[in-house]
Regions:
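Phosphate- and other anionic-substrate recognition elements at nucleic-acid/protein interfaces
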Residues: 1-155
Length: 155
């Protein structure tokens, strides 16, 4: 079984995991591809289900930022639904998946801890850029996929 996790944020990413083990980790940065390219990539991965982070507008964000965020969410939801032939796209709030994977910190430290947990669970995953900086969209997408894969296996 293959499960997809999507972080729809501005620096978002898509991750597909295979239930056969942590060796298969496919990652795609959303900010670097067109929606069509993202669909083609996801279609080739053949996910059985898709989990998208259920996020909403944030207080203090500008109207322009909120609009862009909503637009990204709509695009990835459509891509996901088409890639899994119209099946239901599942959602999970950050609070739920972060608790599930063992995040214990708050605020800006969350991104670092999520990456540390992801590296332990999936050491083959490339979560860092060419200069060594964390690509937090990848880490989030990976942990959303991890959450989804474990939920699917229990059903």
């Amino acid at each position: 079984m293959r499960v997809c996790g999507i972080d729809p944020g501005a620096n978002g990413a898509i991750c597909v995991l295979d239930s056969h083990g942590p060796a298969h980790v496919a990652l795609l940065d959303l900010g670097k591809v067109t929606p069509f390219d993202a669909y083609q990539w996801l279609h080739k991965q053949q996910p059985n289900s898709v989990w998208i982070e259920d996020v909403h507008s944030l207080f203090g964000m500008s109207a322009k930022s909120n609009f862009g965020f909503g637009k990204n969410l709509g695009i990835v939801t459509a891509i996901a639904k088409i890639a899994i032939n119209g099946q239901t796209v599942k959602t999970v709030t950050p609070k739920i998946w972060q608790k599930y994977v063992g995040v214990t910190v708050r605020g800006k430290a969350i991104k670092k801890q999520v990456a540390e947990i992801a590296n332990i669970l999936y050491p083959v995953a490339n979560l860092y850029g060419k200069r060594g900086g964390l690509l937090d969209g990848r880490a989030d997408a990976l942990m959303i996929a991890h959450y989804g894969l474990n939920k699917e296996e229990k059903e």
